[in-house]
Regions:
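Hydrophobic alpha-helical transmembrane segments of multi-pass membrane transport proteins
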Residues: 67-72, 88-159, 180, 184, ...
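Aromatic- and glycine-rich beta-strand/loop motifs that create alpha-glucan
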Residues: 16-17, 22-64
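Alpha-helical transmembrane segments of multi-pass membrane transporters/translocases
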Residues: 3-9, 15-21, 26-27, 69-73, ...
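Alpha-helical transmembrane segments and their short interhelical loops
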Residues: 130-205, 252-279
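Pore- or pathway-lining transmembrane helices of multi-pass membrane proteins that form conduits
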Residues: 59-64, 196-217
Length: 283
């Protein structure tokens, strides 16, 4: 005897008629396909919710920049510039740029993690703009970059940083840095798709970012370096980014450096954005 009891008065659902199914399938009034902007914003919101549910991932965005600012200002400020306060005026824009560029690698790590979980298999079946998933990651990470900028600036102001460019110069410098970081993050999305594990993505990212950030004009003036090292520092893209941000915050806008950063960001976006989407479509 079956263990499932059947109620005598329970209504029996009739099977749908073939003509009714056909009418639904061929109906012309179908839901409108979401726009590229709406899907990108949706995926960006998804990335922000990850931060909400795992707030400890903001440790690198907040604690690390504060530690670097305090350590370099008070340990080396007197020896390098005569006083910690004077050195802070030179150091803080560089610390802000290096901290944000360093945390761009987490975009690639997030992409690689979702691939390993199989989330992208579902994304690729959706009738949406294909790059929106990648763009969403970057939009969500823009919140990280903004938080890092505000934290570093706040600590700097408490320590005695006084930007000559005022509020407008600081805001413009942060916007330029965020725009370049958005383009720069596409490098790590490519590695997130290309490499097999998140540890590999982190290893490659650190191998690239550490030389770029430390062999630059962030901590000292390149004029004090040996000639062979100065030659590398002068062509280092981080050097140009820091120089542009530093000039805007000080009020002495360097049009050449700002233009260089904008053009370099566009080139990086065009190259690595294209490579990322090709890998994504073949993954």
């Amino acid at each position: 005897m079956s263990t499932t009891a059947v109620k005598e008065n329970e209504p029996v659902l009739a099977a749908p008629k073939p003509e009714d199914l056909a009418a639904v399938l061929i109906a012309k009034n179908r839901p409108q396909r979401p726009s590229a902007l709406s899907t990108s914003v949706t995926f960006g919101w998804r990335a922000m919710l990850k931060i909400k549910h795992v707030p400890e991932q903001l440790f690198d965005v907040t604690a690390f920049p504060i530690m670097m600012t305090l350590m370099f200002t008070y340990l080396f400020g007197g020896a390098l510039s005569g006083s910690p306060t004077e050195y802070l005026q030179f150091l803080l824009p560089g610390i802000m740029a290096s901290s944000i560029l360093m945390i761009t690698m987490y975009t690639g790590i997030s992409v690689n993690t979702d691939i390993e979980k199989g989330v992208f298999d579902r994304f690729r079946t959706l009738p949406i703009w294909r790059p929106s998933a990648m763009v969403g990651y970057l939009l969500g990470d823009m919140l990280r970059y903004l938080i890092a900028s505000v934290v570093i600036l706040g600590v700097g102001l408490i320590m005695g940083f006084r930007p000559g460019g005022g509020v407008g110069g600081v805001a413009a410098a942060i916007l330029l840095l965020l725009a370049f970081s958005f383009a720069f993050s596409w490098i790590w999305t490519m590695f997130g798709l290309l490499l097999r594990s998140e540890k590999s993505v982190m290893g490659v990212s650190m191998m690239v970012l550490f030389p770029l950030t430390f062999l630059s004009n962030i901590y000292v003036d390149p004029k004090t370096m040996p000639g062979w090292l100065q030659a590398f520092v002068d062509v280092n893209p981080v050097t140009h980014v820091v120089a542009a941000v530093r000039s805007m915050m000080s009020g002495d806008w360097d049009g050449g450096e700002i233009t260089w950063v904008l053009i370099a960001g566009g080139v990086i976006l065009a190259i690595f954005g294209t490579l990322t989407m090709r890998l994504y479509n073949r993954k």
